[in-house]
Amino acid sequence: DEWLNQPRTEIKVTRIAPPIAFCSATLATPDMATFMRDCGIADAMTMIAVSPFDYENNAMLYIPAGASPSPDQPEFTQWMITEIKTLVNYARGGAFLLFTSYRNMQAATQSLRHDFERMGLLCLVQGEMPKLEIAKRFKDNGNAVLFATKSFWEGVSVEDDALRLVIIDKMPFTSPGPLFDAQKRHLSRYAAEKGVKGRDLEWYPFNNLDVPVMTLDLKQGAGRLIRTQRD
């Protein structure tokens, strides 16, 4: 209290802050609204540039036919492992296997590592050596298989043919936690104050937090595949 009652020196701000530019390959989800909201930016000039990468001719999206088991069912793990084995066999290695949980990563590693090594593929597992060493060995080998979780979804770049396949086990929705739950409660209150009602209010946090965050993570993970115009 004594400190709060001390006289303050008035500070006059006479200089206009310089412009700030935010640049990223993954900010738009699909527009800039979520990023601006999270940063507290009320107004800004935005631009979404066309990608220089030829995804249509240089990449292919594979989604397994038919309905998969729910990720919370025991059958999902074996279904996932079977799909991974088929795809890695087809690509002959050069694969990032990106998992949304350590449990799925460990299950896949235990089931597939021996088979892949018998095929002559180098298997690298997150946690068995430093991240930089794993990335270097993957690039140098050319036909390796990486088993990894969130830390390899971003910040790792493998160019050319050393990486030919990226597999993501399931949609990377954020798990409940104190901070994430608090953000959802805040969004619910915000929506209610804006007059949102009924099911629109019920789904507002999911549509405006869960989905944008998941979309950003998915773009980060899938973005490991095409890194240059040569890929």
Predicted feature residues:
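ASCE RecA-like P-loop NTPase motor cores
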Residues: 1-231
